[in-house]
């Protein structure tokens, strides 16, 4: 039995969240009655309202009047008044991933998982399948520039979704094709141990049906170990590793992007195939690896080499993934969502490859718990930055932790050998600090999952105002 058409209204608590908004948009486009609430106004809330979805700002029991089902994310606390009212009225409550799983049952599905790179890889898979006239439905964890949204309803048989592992609910997703980009220590507040994280990813791959396949990056040691433990599912490996089934070769930086080729070797058939002259308008080895995963899926689904080349060259990227927000006196300002040490290191390396000038990192640590659990890694991931400007920790609802703050992070970076680290007093001071450090040809890279994106977009204008 699939999600009945008469179900509704479907009420989303926290409808403006990036994961929730995409599901709500697709359900609305399918003809379901959707409503919701959110703590504040946002671009996502406004976009959904334009589609005719009724959205309340603020959470209160009356908002759920008439709802047949409540959809909640893990960000919603157990004492939320709408959640309490739904349970008192015996209205079914489902997690975000459960509703996403219901949508996935309507199509054949590609689900992209991994500690980093999910959103970009999801966008790349969508772009390639779109170019191949497969017209996929897409639900992503970031705004796809080509769509201007994080979701679209396609008319084809395929759906492409980002599988968020943060609370373990990605194991509910019925994927026919699974991608695993990498597995690093993250979301330990939920999983408690890194072993539990690895077990979850193994289960994610083993959930793929026998007629499907998984695409896994064996450049990553943990993923390679997982590949060795999975016996009864078809695996296509990728990476620069010479043992990869889809091998990234001849990677070179070019005009702010990358050029490379991908060589395929079919272990069963003993055949080889190469797609050369690939151009990606994004810098960095990490993005080329993400593209290789997407190419592996597209190749397996029968897309032609020429279609893959054209789609990749035209890829418009994802908002908050190495996004240029402006320039000032020859200085380029970049906004990036990177908030884990592995992501930060990859982004700064891409910036280093993109300019002959200095790389100046502006970092807003995201969550006290993440900074605490990965403190050593944070103190060693800024090696490609000539200078690091450190803002206060963005709490994301967490209470402060003693000894885990901006100033201790600054001391940690210096103790680990970084030569130029500046403590930022507040966002209003950023333009003045940058103006004192940056010269023509330099890159200023704003990093974090909090409100630093607003600083990145305001910074070019604030610098110009300084003269």
UniProtKB/Swiss-Prot annotation:
Please write the reaction equations for the catalytic activity of this protein: UDP-N-acetyl-alpha-D-muramate + L-alanine + ATP = UDP-N-acetyl-alpha-D-muramoyl-L-alanine + ADP + phosphate + H(+)
Where does the record say this protein resides? Cytoplasm
Q: Which domain of life is it from?
A: Bacteria
Lineage at the top is:
Bacteria, Pseudomonadati, Pseudomonadota, Alphaproteobacteria, Hyphomicrobiales
Residues where ATP binds: 114-120
- Name this protein carries in UniProt: UDP-N-acetylmuramate--L-alanine ligase
Q: In which pathway does it act?
A: Cell wall biogenesis; peptidoglycan biosynthesis
Q: Extract one GO cellular component term from the record.
A: cytoplasm
